[in-house]
Amino acid sequence: MGDIMIDWFFHTLKSYPEIAIFLSLALGYYFGSFTYKGLGLGAVTATLIAAVIIGQIGITITGPLKPFFFLMFLFAIGYGVGPQFVRGIAQDGVPQAIFAAVVCVFCLLAPYVAAKIAGYDVGSAAGLYAGSQTISASMGLATDAINRLGLSPEETKKILDGMPVAYAVTYIFGTVGSAIVLALLGPALLGIDLEAACKRYEEEYGGKKQLGGPGTAWHQFDVRAFRVRERGPAVGKTVQEAEALIPDQRVFILRLRQEGKIVDATSDAVIHAGDVVAVAGRRDVLVQLIGEQAEEVDDRELLAMPIEGVDVYVTSKDVDSKTLEQLAKAPAARGVFLRKITRGAIAVEIPILPNTKLNRGDIVTIVGRTPDVAAATKMLGRPDRATDMADVAFIGAAIAIGALVGAIVYKIGSVPLTLSTSGGALISGLFFGWLRSVRPTFGRIPSPTVWFMNSVGLNVFIAIVGISSGPGFVAGLKALGFGLFLWGVVATTAPLILAMYVGKYVFRFHDAIVLGCCSGARTTTASLGMVNDRAKSQIPGLGYTVTYAVGNTLLTIWGMVLVMLMT
């Protein structure tokens, strides 16, 4: 009975390969979710392993399913990093963008040299590159390039079957090793006390302007009611003059109770002894403003103000590249406090310091009275309202346009050159992602949808690759041997060590962000998390967003370039 059930199961998977794909995804996402100290296989590697095991029974998958999901994935990658990529190329992120490009060259050359020395074929070399640099997306472009080599179908399949083998063997150290090299070895090799460097960075960029810890006046606040005593420092002053008594702190007088009546605190309203004032700010600073002998009052009616928090998508060119300190002086910023700033495709949290610059495409969480929040939102951009509706017409048109452009073949002499449909979809994503950050009236793709296109798009592609190469996987692993793992260690480690020294001594990045720049250029999010943990700060993330955008793009394209170098 058991044999009959197994035979039926295998026969069903062969007859309906879509079931095998979903089964690979289920197993991959489940086992990929397990981590130890923040490190694990991840969904991509776990899906590949599950697909290879399932593929041992010999399942054939045909049709456009694989390129369909891969194009969707590449577009999502470009769409997510587009604003940071363009900023890095065109504006104030140029040093970090150039650094990322240099690191990407190291990341290409190390596995290329390793593959040449080891004598690997082009498929194994592409897998070695993808695994050691943890850039799964490159396998799609490498596959396109290999298919265009003009080899026989049998030889092409043999080469392509070697790619997932090399990827699976080298990916684990590519992930774990990168985190170890950057977070644990990096500070020692560079002679950096990471925690002290981050504190130094905060002081240099405005952190000491805040009492009670760097940045706290920007996002830690309370609203209290105080009675103004005789001869208090605010007596006889207008609201604007009273708020200016402590220039380095964000303190706002919101309402007044004068002669029993509640009035809004306009900038020219005069404060008198005996008034009850509703003030927003840190409590120790509030007492300093009103006077040491200030009497706190439980005036619930005065304090009953509508307070709201809003996520704002920054689109205004008037605030682009402005520091928080500059923006705080704008009338529209009065009465508003920052809770959080996130940036980039993976929503890296940016430290809140007076000299922190806002960029178009950032999402800032602001809190304050409803009218104050509305004014600040208008100054910054527009509310980033949650929605479950994606502009599918835009997605389809954008991917189609990119793929059409990529399909064009350019001839230089007798040499045909093409971006391929994959490269076209990636570039389309970059362009339209940037365009939406400056013209957010179209092309809405909610973050969960971008995640789905990114994650599921890649993993369906990986599942099909694994299932198709399953029968030849074991034979390929035996042929490549343990030496492949060691070459993967070399290909992972060498570029990172070079990157750290180049970042510190050639580009002269601040000690607090140099490892974040290296993490971004290698697109290794696990490393950034470990670096932040070592630093006990979010400061290293300031070096991550631009380098990640450039690195993610170039490392993906390198999959095609590596095939050209190997042939």
Swiss-Prot record:
GO cellular component terms listed in the entry, alphabetical order: plasma membrane
All residue ranges annotated as the RCK C-terminal domain in the record: 211-295, 297-382
SUPFAM superfamilies: TrkA C-terminal domain-like
Pfam families to which the protein is assigned, alphabetical: Asp-Al_Ex (PF06826), TrkA_C (PF02080)
Gene Ontology process terms (BP): potassium ion transport
Superkingdom of the source species: Bacteria
Name of the protein in question: Uncharacterized transporter bll3476
Record keywords, A-Z: Cell membrane, Membrane, Repeat, Transmembrane, Transmembrane helix, Transport
Compartments it resides in: Cell membrane
Transmembrane region(s): 15-34, 41-63, 68-90, 97-119, 170-192, 392-409, 413-435, 455-477, 481-503, 540-562
Similarity comment: Belongs to the AAE transporter (TC 2.A.81) family.
Principal location listed in the UniProt entry: membrane
Membrane-topology annotation of the record: Multi-pass membrane protein
Gene3D superfamilies (UniProt xref): Regulator of K+ conductance, C-terminal domain
